[in-house]
From Swiss-Prot:
The gene is obg. An essential GTPase which binds GTP, GDP and possibly (p)ppGpp with moderate affinity, with high nucleotide exchange rates and a fairly low GTP hydrolysis rate. Plays a role in control of the cell cycle, stress response, ribosome biogenesis and in those bacteria that undergo differentiation, in morphogenesis control. It is an enzyme of class 3 (hydrolase). This is GTPase Obg. Monomer. It comes from Herminiimonas arsenicoxydans. HAMAP family: GTPase_Obg. Belongs to the TRAFAC class OBG-HflX-like GTPase superfamily. OBG GTPase family. Residues 1-159 form the Obg domain. Its cofactor is Mg(2+). GO terms for molecular function: GTP binding; GTPase activity; magnesium ion binding. One of its GO terms (biological process) is ribosome biogenesis. NCBIfam families: Obg_CgtA, PRK12296.1, PRK12297.1, PRK12299.1. It is found in: Cytoplasm. Residues 160-333 form the OBG-type G domain.
Amino acid sequence: MKFIDEAKIEVIAGDGGNGVASFCREKFRPFGGPDGGDGGKGGSIWAVADRNINTLVDFRYSKMHKARDGENGRGADCYGKGADDIKLRMPVGTLIIDNNDGELIADLTEHGQEVLIAKGGEGGWGNIHFKSSTNRAPRQKSEGKEGERRELRLELKVLADIGLLGMPNAGKSTFISAVSNARPKIADYPFTTLHPNLGVVRVSHEKSFVIADIPGLIEGASDGAGLGIQFLRHLQRTRLLLHIVDLAPFDNVDPVKEAKAIVKELKKYDESLFDKPRWLVLNKLDMVPEEERKKRVKDFIKRFGWKGPVFEISALTHEGCSELVTEIYDYIAVQRQAEQRSEETPQMVEAARGIDSIDPDDPRFKIID
């Protein structure tokens, strides 16, 4: 399936049905009074996050989504039928943005999350609502309200724990295929990866994390060179970035120069992404003679000016990969625990202790300023 991570759509909720002015006409009740029913509610449009969908391709070719109008009211106190709502299923990680003013309407981060994106119009009132002690035969009625109409921009940011950075042919796709169930296209030419790939890395039956591989960056990507930086937003939700470097490039380019170019483009794109935790992964050690490895690694780290974690691997032979995966999971586990602790509010803590609130006059408690 073609990977599409951007789309523009128009959503039109249904109009409410009109109320009706009607009077009861039955045998022996020639002046039975008003009995006009209300109009039905127009259909609304909802966005629903679905983990079984991983692309916005359906919305690239289906741009207009319109809900049905509510039915008009009828006599004999018959109300119009409300229209059914429409649910648009989107990938988890989709941002829904108003295309006119740039307002962020919703961020779909959880499977099954539902967000109202266009509200259906309310039905109009029938004349039965306008009856009063001074107006026994009202002829007033009201029309149904118009449904909301919006132009939306959908942007997909994949949800992953780990993001891979690197030049084309650095071995990112080989690495993700070595440690996960992902099977991206792998070849010996640049820009083999044309769209993000996700893989689930399983450390054990109950321990896993998600890793994202995006197309390689080159110098000048922020100015549109290569595939540009259009896919970098997929790394914004990650907890950790792995900067993969080809330590044995076939064209004899300087790995340090290429690594610095990646960092430069990252900073140009987004300071927050640049400040995200980053580990250095030196790949293709199987291509470096055994006696030169230590010297080449040391020289690279010194010239690159790197002071963070460093891992030496060969994605092709899987050398060093299991150790790296273990370190990644340990790091992710700590991050997840920290996030869970930060989500605990004082109210949650009190509820866990069986205390809903503290009465200042309760002698069991002493308030310390």
